[in-house]
Curated annotation (Swiss-Prot):
It is found in: Virion. GO terms for cellular component: helical viral capsid. Its main location: virion. Keywords: Acetylation, Capsid protein, Helical capsid protein, Virion. The modification N-acetylserine is found at residue 2. One of its GO terms (molecular function) is structural molecule activity. Capsid protein self-assembles to form rod-shaped virions about 18 nm in diameter with a central canal enclosing the viral genomic RNA. Pfam families: TMV_coat. The gene is CP. Belongs to the virgaviridae capsid protein family. This is Capsid protein.
C-alpha cells in the first residue's frame, strides 16, 4: 500500500511542511504578544514557528486518519509564511554604524526605527497568517489529501 505518485510535483507533500492546526494557531496568538526588540527574541520565535513543521506522510505512510493538518506550502499560506520568516531576519540590518563601538545619535535613532519597523512587519505577517488559518486556508484532512495523491492498496490475492 502506498501513494500513487504520477507527477514529480507530488513529492512536495512528503516534505516537512505540515503542522498541527491548534499548535500553529496557538503559536500565532502567542507570538503576537511577544517583544521583538532584540535579534535573539526574533530568532527564538522564528525557531518556534519552524519547530511546528514536520513531515506527516511518506510514500508508504498514509495521511493521518482523523483531523486536519496545516499545509504551509499551500498557495495561500506559502507567501505569508515566507514573508514572516524573512521579517524575523533583521540581523546586520538594524545597526549599521561608521564606528561600531560608538554609534552616533542619528545611527542609534535609525537603528531604533529599524527595530520598530521589524516589529511592525513581524506582527503584521503573524496577523495575516492567523487570519488565513482562522478562515480554514491551507488545512487538509485525509480525504482532501487523497484527492491530490491517491492511496493505492495492494490487489487481493
Amino acid at each position: 500500500m502506498s501513494y500513487n505518485i504520477t507527477s514529480s510535483n507530488q513529492y512536495q507533500y512528503f516534505a516537512a511542511m505540515w503542522a498541527e492546526p491548534q499548535a500553529m494557531l496557538n503559536q500565532c496568538v502567542s507570538a503576537l504578544s511577544q517583544s521583538y526588540q532584540t535579534q535573539a527574541a526574533r530568532d527564538t520565535v522564528r525557531q518556534q514557528f519552524s519547530n511546528l513543521l514536520s513531515a506527516i506522510v511518506t510514500p508508504n505512510q498514509r495521511f493521518p486518519e482523523s483531523g486536519y493538518r496545516v499545509y504551509i506550502n499551500s498557495a495561500v499560506l506559502k507567501p505569508l509564511y515566507e514573508a514572516l520568516m524573512k521579517s524575523f531576519d533583521t540581523r546586520n540590518r538594524i545597526i549599521e554604524t561608521e564606528e561600531e563601538s560608538r554609534p552616533s545619535a542619528s545611527e542609534v535613532a535609525n537603528a531604533t526605527q529599524r527595530v520598530d519597523d521589524a516589529t511592525v512587519a513581524i506582527r503584521s505577517q503573524i496577523q495575516l497568517l492567523l487570519n488565513e488559518l482562522s478562515n480554514g486556508h491551507g488545512l487538509m484532512n485525509r480525504a482532501e489529501f487523497e484527492v491530490l495523491l491517491p492511496w493505492t492498496t495492494a490487489p487481493a490475492t
